[in-house]
Each structure stands twice: as structure tokens, then as C-alpha cells.
Amino acid sequence: MKGFVASVVLLACGALAADIVEPEDCTSFPCMIFEDNFDYLDNDIWEHEITMSGGGNWEFQAYVNNRSISYTRDSTLFIKPDLTSNWKGEDFLSSGTLDLWGMNGRGDVCTGNSYYGCSRVGSSSNIINPVTSARLRTMSNFAFRYGRLEVRAKMPRGDWLWPAIWMLPRNWPYGLWPASGEIDILESRGNDDFGTLGNQYGGTTLHWGPFWPYNFFEKTHAEYSANTGSFADDFHVWRLDWTKDNMEFYVDDVLQLTVDPGTSFWDFAGMGPFFDNPWAAGAKMAPFDQKFYLILNVAVGGTNGFFPDGIASKPWSNLSPTAFLDFWNARDEWLPSWKAGEDRISEGAAMQVDYVRVWKMESTEQ
């Protein structure tokens, strides 16, 4: 049994809930303010996003709330994608209407209507999202500013899977994306054979800029490889050390990226006097001087270029108007990598999370 901090709620079944401590209640430091060891899926902490919006990337999955897809076992969270046809039948993809609007509140109601995210009608050339998966967030229940975050996780193995551990601003105080920032602690790909972009590799990125399309993520991005094998072979620990002066990102205690903007991110970007600075009233780390919440998800495919054209045997083009259909028609090529010799999709195709922990390191302000 894993260790737990004090004041964790003991449930009748013997499982322990995620624990949250208000930073102002810390009396010594480091002070753990969040811990989830996933003895069970705590829906009071983790909210399922319900949407087909594809993250603005025209990804191929629909995010749903289903215990065949997101579940816990042996103190581990699994996010394991499935085929929409296993839920609705193959004919539904090209002739059905998938309505995610819901009516019963959190966990049932659509959370993202952009990009036709709440309702879609399938046709022969424009099919409904062929995959279902899960995206969990702590937006309503836990967010933090400054401290240490650790996530111990194992990445999925399977062609065109796109796992991510990341953070978004709770209140978007500097405006719409990317003005209020995005913290991508890890993004990876499930492919065994995808050149230098397969599951042996991961990436860490900050997205920031005054407004789209000005996004200076290239200045705050690092790519790295697993010490041995791939990130789908075993568990690894991703860590963020976040202070009012800088950010440091580690994998298995090895520093991968340091972000120190100097005087400000505005000066770091070199924007000059021709634009208004949305972070002028913020601290040095603005837009990363505010509370962010946690997100865990497994996406699939997409046309934004995360899976570039011209590498391996990618079955769709990022410019194709029928990318969903092209991907689905090639399922005999990619689905075996998800099943790994089993009759159904293997748990090897799941992102597995052992724990998530957050500390305040020096004071409530650091």
C-alpha cells in the first residue's frame, strides 16, 4: 500500500480518496497539498470532459465518461481508448447522430461545444469520431500556483495514440489561448515505429503569446528520450518545479528544460512596442503566475501536425478533408498495435498513472 498524507478520507470500502490541503493550512515545508494514489477514481476531484471537439486539432476521439475507458485497478488509473463502433456499431459512424449534450449535470453534460463538439451527424465521407477515450481534469476542485508537481505514469503503446499530462489556467486572466498560458508536462506518441517521434520520446512545452497566432512555444520546448527502452515499457516520473522566478522540468530526476524569462515573458518574446502587453500587470512569470489545473488524457491522431506527414505508414494526410475516414479505413493496420495479440484492446494501449502529488516547497507564496 502506498503512503498517504494525514487527513485523507477513509471510505467504507477501505479505499483512500484523493487528499487536498489548502496552502494556508501548511505549517511546515515542503507541504503536500494534493495527493491521489488512485485507490479508486475520485469523481469529486477528477471531472470527465465530454466532447468531440478534438482539442482544436481535429483529433479522432470523442471524450466520454465510461468505466471501460477510464478506471482504476491495483491503485493505478487507466485511460484506455476504445472503438466507437464497439459502442454504437460500425454503421453508426456513417449514418448516426452522436449527441453528447446530456442533461444530468457533471459527468453527463457536454463540456466543449467548439468545433462541433457536442453533436455530430455521420455521413459516408465525414464519419463520426471513430474512437472513444477519456480526458480528466481537476478544474473545479484543485488548481495551484507555484510548487512541485510529480506524476508517475506509463505511456500507452499503440499507433497514433497521443497521451498527455498537462495544465491549463483556471480563470484565463490574461485572455484567450495562448495569452493565459499552457503547461505541457508531457506529450508523447504511442507508435513503436515512428522514426524519432515514437514512444521512446517525449516532449515538454510551455505555450504562451499575446494572442493567436503569436505563440512562442519554440522558446520553451524540449524533447528527450527514455533512458532505456520506451516510455511505454515502464513507469517514469515527470516533475515540475515551479517558482515565482522559473520553471524546471525533470524526467526521472534528470533535468530536461529550464524556463527563466529574465525580466518578463514579454521581453523574452521580443515583441517590441507594436503590440499591447497582456501581462504588464502580472508578475515576472506572467502568464505563469496564476493557478493552473491538471489534465490527464489520451488523444488519437489529429491533423495539426503532431503526427507529421511523410513518416512511417501514416494512413491519413493532415490536409485531407476525409482524415477521420482515412484513419478508420486503415484500422487493420493500426488496431493490431492496440490489441497486442489480444482479442480486445490491450491495457498496454492505456496511459497508466500511479500517482499525482503536489507540494508547496518553501512558503505559501513560493
Swiss-Prot record:
Gene3D superfamilies: 2.60.120.200. The lineage of its organism: Eukaryota, Metazoa, Ecdysozoa, Arthropoda, Crustacea. Binds to beta-1,3-glucan. May play a role in recognition of microorganisms and in activation of the prophenoloxidase cascade. Glycans are attached at N66. GO terms for molecular function: (1->3)-beta-D-glucan binding; hydrolase activity, hydrolyzing O-glycosyl compounds. PANTHER family: GLYCOSIDE HYDROLASE FAMILY 16 PROTEIN, GLYCOSYL HYDROLASE-RELATED. Keywords: Glycoprotein, Immunity, Innate immunity, Secreted, Signal. Residues 1-17 form the signal peptide. Residues 18-364 form the GH16 domain. It is found in: Secreted. GO terms for cellular component: extracellular region. This is Beta-1,3-glucan-binding protein. It comes from the Eukaryota. Constitutively expressed in hemocytes. It comes from Penaeus monodon (Giant tiger prawn). Belongs to the glycosyl hydrolase 16 family. Induction: Not induced by injection with the beta-1,3-glucan curdlan or the shrimp pathogen V.harveyi. The keyword Secreted applies. It holds the Pfam family Glyco_hydro_16. GO terms for biological process: carbohydrate metabolic process; innate immune response.
